[in-house]
């Protein structure tokens, strides 16, 4: 068994800044041929519920960490898995029977699969050689990425104010302090002075904040595309039956008799997509309770993501290209953690140290697999190495 202490864990908060290099698509709902962006309701600076664009934490967690990170780990170790294990690793599994609480299984998973320890899963019955289904709790919370804008300003100011425009910070501070003073003693009615201070703060600072902090709708753009009917293209009609194939061209359909021309409904249509414009910034908070090896796996996965850093849908059109910057908090310690961008990755000392630990773990892992003719892991995963 690998000599790896799964109980030596630290709590780390990563503050993630996402800079869009091309427009971003993240669809919340589709109405006809119109794709609408995903939004949630937030309480804005005026205390009113307002819609705001978010890139869901689930999309970040699964799109970057679960799919890319798990695939990279299996590639590194040369492992294959059976379909049930594949679903458990890449799709989060399922609960399909009575649940158990096998602590030895939980320990084994965290020793042999740090990526699954980080992400968690719902282990179906029979998977990993254990009869009962079981929840494996993850060690990371990935928050949704909020567009930095007027609607999200109260939340981002509390979490990571450095992402907000410099000219907005004084007004946000005064408003935040005045609002907190209203509820300093929740057992009694706020004082008349506190109420007046809050009213004055809104009157004095809200107009300027609306100028320096743009509404999320000002980052919105509409991309209309025409999906053409290929059967109406004169250059492509020749590939249809009866379309006069060129010399030497054989029909894949065999001989066909000419048919009378019939009216066919055109497949041509105009599609309309909502996108968040290039240059916008999003903020996501990640909370980790991880070992050094698990943190190193996260760093390694982010470096893999940097090889093709696209978020959201419609990447085939170049949408979703981005760069990411992470800052960390660990107790009273805080600082820069990691930058990822195509060809321009930068690792801080803590990030590099964690990544080195993960690479050393992989080296030991390969030795563990080579020494075991009938590896415990191979039976565990139900596949062959």
Residue ranges of model-derived segments:
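RNA-binding basic/glycine-rich loop and surface signature characteristic of RAMP-family CRISPR effectors
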Residues: 1-385
């Amino acid at each position: 068994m690998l000599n790896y202490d799964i109980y030596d864990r630290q709590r780390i908060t990563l503050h993630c800044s996402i800079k869009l290099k091309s427009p971003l698509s993240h669809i919340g709902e589709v109405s006809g041929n119109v794709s609408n962006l995903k939004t949630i309701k937030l309480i804005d600076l005026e205390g009113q519920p307002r819609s705001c664009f978010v890139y869901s934490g689930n999309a970040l967690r699964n799109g970057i960490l679960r799919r890319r990170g798990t695939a990279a780990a299996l590639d590194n170790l040369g492992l294959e898995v059976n379909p049930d294990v594949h679903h458990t690793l890449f799709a989060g599994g399922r609960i399909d029977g009575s649940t158990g609480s096998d602590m030895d299984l939980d320990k084994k998973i965290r020793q042999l699969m740090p990526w699954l320890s980080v992400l968690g899963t719902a282990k179906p019955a029979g998977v990993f050689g254990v009869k009962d289904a079981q929840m494996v709790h993850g060690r990371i919370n990935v928050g949704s990425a909020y567009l930095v804008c007027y609607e999200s300003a109260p939340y981002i100011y509390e979490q990571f104010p450095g992402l907000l425009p410099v000219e907005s910070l004084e007004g946000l501070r005064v408003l935040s302090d005045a609002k907190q003073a209203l509820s300093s003693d929740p057992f009694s009615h706020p004082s008349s002075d506190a109420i007046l201070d809050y009213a004055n703060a809104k009157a004095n600072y809200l107009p300027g904040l609306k100028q320096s902090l743009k509404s999320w709708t000002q980052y919105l753009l509409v991309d209309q595309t025409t999906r053409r009917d290929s059967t109406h293209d004169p250059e492509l009609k020749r590939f249809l039956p009866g379309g006069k194939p060129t010399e030497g061209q054989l029909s894949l359909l065999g001989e066909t008799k000419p048919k009378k021309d019939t009216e066919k409904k055109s497949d041509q249509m105009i599609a309309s997509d909502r996108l968040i414009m290039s240059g916008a910034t999003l903020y996501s908070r990640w909370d980790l309770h991880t070992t050094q090896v698990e943190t190193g796996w996260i760093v390694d996965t982010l470096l893999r993501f940097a090889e093709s850093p696209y978020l959201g849908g419609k990447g085939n059109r170049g949408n979703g290209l981005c760069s990411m910057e992470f800052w960390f908090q660990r107790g009273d310690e805080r600082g820069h953690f990691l930058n990822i961008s195509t060809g321009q990755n930068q690792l801080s000392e803590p990030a590099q140290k964690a990544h080195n630990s993960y690479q050393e773990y992989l080296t030991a892992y390969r030795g563990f697999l080579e020494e075991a003719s009938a590896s415990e892991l191979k039976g565990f995963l139900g596949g062959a190495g």
